[in-house]
């Protein structure tokens, strides 16, 4: 019993010491905020530079990017940026881009003659649309975060079939094709349709 009390006192003393010697960091930088995207933009190209269409009214000029990050292609992208004090006469606020990552951006595909042809060409494998801030219709794009089963052996394809209902031109169908990839675990991806 004496040994137990001795070890209990030592353990309590060590815990008290650990709590009392903890340091307080006054490192108040917001570095962690740079690890997540803070905007979904359309990267638009004009001449030898690009700008970001943030929403229907807001454009941003990347101040620290001197070339077009995706060539001459207009794409949707997730971006993490920091505001600056500078202004651009044409594009509004100037931002510093911490990082940018493009989203698969593609056109809708035509509806084929029969549902069987659509199944064969575009697939009919399980896909879920995730309710998220990235799932949005803006700037002429339908941008989706979607969830599917992946095996990472073969590339999957994702398509938006247009004109599936002649009576309703706004009715579309999202199709996922695993292309024979084993469906092992759930994972998310992004796609934007123009």
Region locations from a protein language model:
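Bacterial Sec-dependent N-terminal signal peptides
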Residues: 1-4, 14-43
